[in-house]
């Protein structure tokens, strides 16, 4: 049976979930990956209000939608980051506080623990959930990084300096992961520039830093790997059991006018000079056929969650065509050898 196709609501948080849900259904999706900003999934309210999660499910069911994950990228970013004025725009006021770096980090850490508890409560309330269902809930997100600014290794950067960054990540995230463990929730880091893991090598190093904590894995997204030159299909095979969730998202590279490189040239997305940019699914350079084959090989059975971004295209048009693209692309794996019928018993 093909995997459910869902839409990540993070880029749609200007709409209430009540406004967005019928649009998601009309675009052809089976469900949503709920962002923890806007009013889509408010973690504090989920814990404080007795009927909050039930009402969310009622709204989704009204429009024939399900949910398989929630995502709190924005708060997670602040756990390890070197905080500056940009963070104020993406953080809840109670996390930002006075903007002092260590205070922001600590409040972000507590909010991620709250996210785990809220996610567990939400998925426990899923309509039709069997009492014997002990499957982990999924929270996707970012970690931030105290060493991203050293990615180019100048001033000269030795491994001891980088080790300190991975140690800082472990110190801040292991206590969070312990709450995830207590709540039976998996945390899926979206491997992405600005995070502690942004390619295959750094993903291995991040896993090692948290001693392969069972609750730490990945939200696979090829769009953040391809333009870097990372083998995005190998990532699937390298981390198969740690891929808890994924984003279907496209990107092209090798474009532009030659004046802007892989670092972006301090240009905006959709600037025609850019070397790379995110595209609607099927319009970029990611080989999704190879991705589906690899996902079948590792027996990934979770949703195919479309994270739609394309600065050149209307989002309703783009998200609709992306849903159609994913549905045509996905297929169930073969359950028997194709040549089995040749043999006599």
Where are these regions (language model features)?
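Glycine-rich, proline-tolerant flexible connector loops at the mouths of alpha/beta enzymes
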Residues: 35-57, 61, 143-148
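Conserved beta-strand positions in the central sheet of alpha/beta enzyme cores
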Residues: 33, 69-71, 128, 140, ...
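Active-site-proximal loop/turn and secondary-structure-junction residues that shape catalytic pockets
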Residues: 11-13, 36-38, 73-76, 143-147, ...
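C-terminal helical cap(s) of enzyme catalytic domains, especially alpha/beta-barrels
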Residues: 315-335
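Acidic/histidine-rich catalytic cores of soluble enzymes
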Residues: 4-5, 31-32, 70, 153-285, ...
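Active-site acidic/histidine proton-transfer and metal-coordination neighborhood
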Residues: 14, 19, 23, 62, ...
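Boundary/entry segment of secreted carbohydrate-active catalytic domains
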Residues: 1-15
């Amino acid at each position: 049976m093909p995997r459910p196709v869902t839409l990540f609501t993070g880029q749609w948080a200007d709409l209430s979930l009540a406004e967005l849900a019928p649009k998601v259904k009309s675009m052809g999706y089976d469900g949503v990956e709920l962002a923890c900003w806007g009013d889509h999934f408010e973690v504090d309210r989920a814990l404080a209000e007795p009927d909050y999660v039930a009402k969310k499910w009622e709204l989704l069911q009204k429009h024939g939608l399900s949910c398989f994950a929630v995502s709190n990228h924005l708060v997670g970013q602040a756990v390890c980051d070197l905080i500056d004025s940009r963070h104020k725009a993406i953080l809840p006021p109670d996390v930002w506080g006075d903007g002092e770096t260590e205070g922001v980090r600590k409040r972000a850490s507590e909010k991620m623990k709250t996210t785990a508890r809220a996610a567990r409560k939400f998925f426990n309330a899923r309509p039709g959930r069997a009492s014997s269902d002990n499957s982990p809930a999924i929270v996707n997100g970012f970690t931030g990084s105290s060493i991203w600014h050293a990615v180019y290794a100048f001033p000269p950067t030795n491994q001891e300096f980088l080790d300190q960054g991975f140690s800082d990540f472990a110190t801040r995230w292991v206590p969070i992961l312990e709450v995830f463990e207590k709540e039976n929730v998996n945390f899926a880091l979206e491997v992405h520039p600005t995070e502690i893991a942004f390619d295959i090598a750094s993903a291995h190093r991040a896993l090692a830093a948290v001693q392969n904590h069972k609750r730490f894995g990945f939200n696979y997204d090829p769009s953040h790997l391809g333009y870097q030159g990372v083998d995005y299909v190998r990532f699937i095979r390298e981390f198969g059991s740690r891929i808890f969730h994924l984003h279907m998202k496209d990107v092209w590279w090798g474009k532009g006018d030659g004046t802007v490189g892989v670092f972006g040239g301090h240009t905006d997305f959709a600037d025609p000079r850019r070397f790379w940019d995110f595209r609607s699914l099927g319009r970029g350079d990611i080989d999704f056929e190879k991705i589906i084959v690899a996902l079948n090989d590792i027996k990934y059975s979770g949703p195919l969650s479309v994270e739609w971004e394309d600065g050149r295209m209307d989002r309703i048009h783009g998200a609709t065509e992306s849903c159609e693209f994913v549905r045509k692309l996905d297929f169930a794996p073969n359950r028997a050898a194709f040549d089995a019928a040749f043999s006599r018993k």
